[in-house]
């Protein structure tokens, strides 16, 4: 049976969490005191919120952490009845561990309705002796102020490139293979600060039997940087038909969607040597194209319009 690497290599202690030194130091101080407040972990996907909560539970409860930590996903449990019944029933039960409390980890808490959050606030107050809540969310602004004021808020940033690279090298060494420099660059690029995504892509390319930039971009649904560079160059220089031919190849032969291409263009433009003025205009054009495609417009028409816009941008002098 294939073991999922994101679980196999999940941190077992707070010291193994990369890139969150300030948050980790705070959590370690809570562990030393054997007491934690309610917590709110805020940050984008793959920044280590769940891993940090589990590592905290392991350090507090040791081998019995699974019996003393309840994980729930608020996107599946977002109704007020769930708060009034299921979560309340869990919170009221006093655990048998020496610390006298358990952890209830509520992932995607920003998916809870405001009404459900208000009910949850009351549950937090009543059962704070037996249950410590850890909320995880992408957007702290979607958490009502009464809950924010009752938690210690910790913000998780995208994982720095060097930490992603280090973790992937550790996994490769443990699994008995090597990652060349170009492939590592591609892995770091497509992960965009998301450690979970980086590990999943690494396992996918390893399982495919080919660890290469081409395979990485293929698996993730990214156009290769070479094709993107050629397409932008042709478009900006007014070579509409040539740019369109490259886009057609990405759609037909590479199997990419319009959104895949737009997001690949965005990733490339952000780090390219294009002039700042052109970069601003191109990113605005990409945002417009993405919005229209997401709203249901035809991919091909929107990509043609995007190429035309790039040609218009290129025709202007700085």
From Swiss-Prot:
Record keywords: ATP-binding, DNA replication, Nucleotide-binding
GO BP, one annotated term: DNA-templated DNA replication
Cellular compartments per GO CC: DNA replication factor C complex
Gene3D superfamilies: 1.10.8.60, 1.20.272.10, P-loop containing nucleotide triphosphate hydrolases (3.40.50.300)
Tagged with keyword Nucleotide-binding: yes
GO molecular function: ATP binding; ATP hydrolysis activity; DNA binding; DNA clamp loader activity
Ligand binding (ATP): 43-50
InterPro entries documented for this protein: AAA+_ATPase, ATPase_AAA_core, DNA_pol3_clamp-load_cplx_C, DNA_Rep/Repair_Clamp_Loader, P-loop_NTPase, Rep_factor-C_ssu_arc, Rep_factorC_C, RFC_lid
Signal peptide: none
SUPFAM superfamilies: P-loop containing nucleoside triphosphate hydrolases (SSF52540), post-AAA+ oligomerization domain-like (SSF48019)
Pfam family membership, one: AAA
Subunit structure of this chain's protein: Heteromultimer composed of small subunits (RfcS) and large subunits (RfcL).
Its biological purpose: Part of the RFC clamp loader complex which loads the PCNA sliding clamp onto DNA.
HAMAP family: RfcS
Homology family: Belongs to the activator 1 small subunits family. RfcS subfamily.
Protein's name in the database: Replication factor C small subunit
Gene: rfcS
């Amino acid at each position: 049976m294939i073991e999922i690497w994101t679980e196999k290599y999940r941190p077992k202690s707070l010291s193994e969490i990369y890139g969150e030194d300030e948050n980790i130091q705070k959590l370690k101080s809570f562990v030393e005191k054997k007491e934690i407040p309610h917590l709110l972990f805020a940050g984008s996907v793959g920044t280590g919120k769940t891993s940090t909560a589990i590592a905290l539970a392991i350090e507090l409860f040791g081998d019995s952490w699974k019996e003393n930590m309840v994980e729930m996903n608020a996107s599946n449990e977002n109704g007020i009845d769930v708060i009034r019944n299921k979560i309340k029933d869990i919170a009221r039960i006093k655990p048998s561990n020496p610390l006298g409390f358990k952890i209830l980890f509520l992932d995607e808490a920003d998916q809870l309705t405001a009404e459900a959050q208000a009910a949850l606030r009351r549950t937090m107050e009543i059962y704070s002796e037996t249950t410590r809540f850890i909320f995880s969310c992408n957007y702290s602004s979607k958490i009502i102020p009464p809950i924010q004021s009752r938690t210690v808020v910790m913000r998780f940033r995208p994982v720095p490139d060097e930490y992603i690279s280090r973790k992937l090298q550790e996994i490769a060494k443990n699994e008995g293979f090597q990652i060349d420099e170009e492939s590592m660059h591609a892995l770091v690029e497509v992960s965009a600060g998301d450690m979970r995504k980086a590990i999943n892509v690494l396992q996918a390319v390893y399982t495919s039997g080919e660890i290469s930039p081409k395979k990485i971009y293929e698996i993730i649904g990214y156009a290769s940087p070479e094709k993107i560079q050629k397409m932008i160059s042709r478009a900006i220089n007014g070579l509409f038909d040539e740019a369109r031919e490259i886009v057609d190849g990405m759609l037909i032969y590479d199997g990419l969607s319009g959104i895949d291409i737009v997001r690949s263009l965005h990733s490339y433009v952000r780090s390219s040597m294009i002039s700042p003025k052109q970069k601003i205009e191109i990113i605005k054009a990409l945002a417009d194209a993405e919005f229209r495609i997401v709203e249901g417009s035809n991919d091909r028409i929107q990509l043609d319009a995007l190429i035309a816009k790039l040609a218009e941008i290129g025709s202007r002098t700085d």
